Structure formats: structure tokens, C-alpha cells
Amino acid sequence: MNIRLVGLSILSIFIIVPLSKLAAQEPFNQNFSPDITAPDGFRSNRTSYSAIMDVLEPPVTEVTEEQLQRLRDVPLEVIFGAIGDYRLNYATGFENTQPGKRLVGRALTMRFLPPRPDLTEAALTLAKEGNWDRRYYARAAEEANPGDVVVAELGGSDGHNLFGDMGATGIQMRGAAGVIIDGGMRDYTGLRDERFEDFPVFYKFSDPHTTSWLGVEYNTPVRIGGVTVLPGDIVVGDTGGVFFFPS
């Protein structure tokens, strides 16, 4: 008996049977639409829904200003040794408008995308429905809490810029601790002014153009460099890079 032929015959059974079952299945309906109707005003109520955040349900731990103050004096190496499996949540490659100034606070996240006609039209539709502003830095100037760090996903070194000194002023006036931009900023000279000495901005590049990218998600998970940042994460930024970890 040819053992090789027997082996091939047995293997063919395991291949043919699943394929035959697959062939009997109903084809996926590409036009399927879930029977869900959003309540009036839901789309434009300034909240970006995230299913993954519903599942994660990160615990809301009140981090006091005193605790944040302590982190300003803890070496990054000590933090590295204390955060366990979150050690890899460390993003690098930033410049700092206030060299040597550490940035500590809670993450207020936002995500931006390059404009295209249909996306721009969608943003305009939401603006007509309610209080929706694609310039999420302006929204942060209305909603940020003291100690927040605005964390903006803007495509890294190939992306666009977020804001300039006027946008930063609004966020600073809310008591926010600073900003981290995975992308660019404008008004480099202005943001290095002494009035921003306690408001460091970590950024990838400086660009004089005004921003044109659209804010699409607010206070949802974002990607900064090669790491994931969740709303409310503790942020510790220093020379060399930034740690993000749960509170």
C-alpha cells in the first residue's frame, strides 16, 4: 500500500468537508444595515461613542493634584519599574517647547484626519445639527479640566499641525497642564514665550500653515507613535519621551 497516497486521501477529507460546508452558507449581504435609529441630537451631542471603551470600562480613579505633583519629581526609570506591563506604553521622538520642563497630568484625547470632500461635508452636517466644531483644540478650550493634558493624534511626522499660540492660550486658561501632539504645531516662537513656561507642548515638528485636518473622535482611544492612549491615562512627559498608563 502506498502510504503517501493514503495520507493524501485522509488530508483531502479534512479539506473538502469544510469547503463543502462553506459553499452551503448564505453569502454575506453587503447591503446589510442594522435596524438602529439614533435619538434626535445624538450625533451632534459632542460625544464620540467608543464601543471598545464600553467594554474596557476603565476605572475612574480620582488622581489628586498632590499625587500628580509627586510624579513631577519621580525619575522616569522609577516609573518604568513601577508600571508593570505598561512599560512599553512609552512614546518617543518629541520636541518640547519648554526644554527640561516635565509634563504631568490626565489624558484628554482627540483624533484628527486629513480632509476630503465627503468627510468635510459630514463635519458640516454635524455642525448644522448641533454644537459641533471640527477644531477639537477649541473644544478643549471650553471643556478641559485643571490637570488635563490634551493628547492629539495627527499622523506623526507625516501628519499636520494642531494649533498655534492662540489655541494654546484657550486650553491653558482652562487650567490644563500642557499638550502632546503626534504631529505638528505652528507659532513656534510664541509657544516658547515666558507666558507658556508652565505649559509645555510636546510636538513632532513646527509648520507655519493653519490647521485643516478634521477632528473626528474626542476622548476615545488614540494612537501616539507606537502606543495606545486611553482617556484618563496618567501622562508623564520628560526629556526623551512620554509614559501613558492607567490611573
Named regions from a protein language model:
Residues 132, 138-183:
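Extracellular/luminal Protease-associated
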Residues 1-9:
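Bacterial N-terminal signal peptides that target proteins for export
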Residues 172-211:
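Ligand/cofactor pocket segment of small-molecule handling proteins
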Residues 9-21:
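Bacterial N-terminal signal peptides
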Residues 204-247:
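Acidic, glycine-rich flexible loop/linker segments
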Residues 92-94, 151-153, 179-183, 201-203, ...:
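General beta-strand structural signal in soluble alpha/beta enzymes
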Residues 55-130:
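N-terminal low-complexity or amphipathic/hydrophobic leaders
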